[in-house]
Amino acid sequence: MRLVLSSLIVIAGLLSSQATAATAPEQTASADIRDSGFVYCVSGQVNTFNPQKASSGLIVDTLAAQLYDRLLDVDPYTYRLVPELAESWEVLDNGATYRFHLRRDVSFQKTAWFTPTRKLNADDVVFTFQRIFDRRHPWHNINGSSFPYFDSLQFADNVKSVRKLDNNTVEFRLTQPDASFLWHLATHYASVMSAEYAAQLSRKDRQELLDRQPVGTGPFQLSEYRAGQFIRLQRHDGFWRGKPLMPQVVVDLGSGGTGRLSKLLTGECDVLAWPAASQLTILRDDPRLRLTLRPGMNIAYLAFNTDKPPLNNPAVRHALALSINNQRLMQSIYYGTAETAASILPRASWAYDNDAKITEYNPQKSREQLKALGIENLTLHLWVPTSSQAWNPSPLKTAELIQADMAQVGVKVVIVPVEGRFQEARLMDMNHDLTLSGWATDSNDPDSFFRPLLSCAAINSQTNFAHWCNPEFDSVLRKALSSQQLASRIEAYEEAQNILEKELPILPLASSLRLQAYRYDIKGLVLSPFGNASFAGVSREKHEEVKKP
């Protein structure tokens, strides 16, 4: 699943001899971009250009919406399912069969490595999903057999078949009804690939390039990539929704923290994704900048490795949770841009349990409970991502605050910074004690939180960092999926939240607003509560430059 990328390499050198290398890497982000596009500054790593092969990261948070489309989308304002590649669909057999009718004039991108000869059809959808769920499919094991999001849902066990009824109709048959199925197909993990491109790679015996040299139907296509520096996206002129307004977008990967803010202030960046909450005053006071805030479908949490004593004891997990001053996290990390979490679900979720209780901060009680449990001289290793995330703008600072809190109750915490591109592989060796992580979903269905993060299947799919497996909990989740009645599902998810409150495999910390800052002349930028939004409608308004007072 992980790609090994050198530090100075364009997509041509990495994946193909056909693309053109940039000769001046120091100037690529801004040399010609103001006249023909914009610079989007974000912190993150690129492990793959196929969101199906990732559990999170830049491909899921930013790139998938530019490169690919899905059968369905979620409206960022109404939170309802809307058509995308499927112009209509039918739910049959009480939710065990789903039939999709595809749009007839959708073009794949023409790139340096592939020229399509036909439009999107049912073969592409069948190929995309058979590769994921059919373990005997010739493409299933290419670049590893892991499809983290779908593996956590046990997708391969639940999908009986996906078949082409005609050139523009596809039917999924499930082993049992699943009320969340459509919502999972609306995530960016369900991006549709080109079967024709896959066939070309098979003839060349270069199947591994499917996930590295992307070909999709989205508004932009990959033009150039320099690891740790930038990604250049070129407009897909044949995009089915109409030509994107700007010819190119540069995704700047080169700076973190205050470096990205400096680039925004000097005009080297046009858009700053996930600015630190501590920077809000600067952003609000500068007339050259605009700031957008929206509630987000995300959760930041602390995961306890329940495979390792003494963290395998729920009483120890509860005692440690009492030591954490969550109110201080709200003030020092989020600066009023988040609310303390009482559940794995954000409060915006329709299944949120209003009776859920925030874990109290009581260090004295924590010390007493740890002593009663015989816990002394405990040392825990806390693994932390190094870059800002949609759910946590300052993970390392958060870890330092947790470290100080636990020290007050006699627990030594050793912070282990982990770079994003290596985090999943290192976490799966199960040597960590605690993990500071989070989850953002582009689905409004609560199943998008529960199963990927805490189901038994999610352990092997590398998304269950607590390594917690509870058959009763899994049974409740299956009960929720078996009903098309909202009231029944809400009741089941309340039961699931009660189990989590009792067992505490993860400690919910915060549900944050989504933040995005941008230059005054950038128009049409959408900030979705689900994260990944298309850049197709973004433009630059030309007028006299605003000066800082």
Swiss-Prot record:
Residues 1-21 form the signal peptide. Induction: Part of the sapA-sapB-sapC-sapD-sapF operon, RNA detected in mid-log phase cells. InterPro entries: Peptide/Ni-bd (IPR030678), SBP_5 (IPR039424), SBP_5_CS (IPR023765), SBP_5_dom (IPR000914). GO terms for cellular component: ATP-binding cassette (ABC) transporter complex; outer membrane-bounded periplasmic space. Keywords: Peptide transport, Periplasm, Protein transport, Signal, Transport. It is found in: Periplasm. Pfam families: SBP_bac_5. PROSITE patterns: SBP_BACTERIAL_5 (PS01040). Disruption phenotype: More senstitive to protamine than wild-type cells, but not as sensitive as sapC, sapD or sapF deletions. GO terms for molecular function: peptide transmembrane transporter activity. One of its GO terms (biological process) is peptide transport. Gene3D superfamilies: Dipeptide-binding Protein, Domain 1, Dipeptide-binding Protein, Domain 3, Periplasmic binding protein-like II. Involved in a peptide intake transport system that plays a role in the resistance to antimicrobial peptides. Belongs to the bacterial solute-binding protein 5 family. NCBIfam families: PRK15109.1 (NF011689). This is Peptide transport periplasmic protein SapA. It comes from Salmonella typhimurium (strain LT2 / SGSC1412 / ATCC 700720). The gene is sapA.
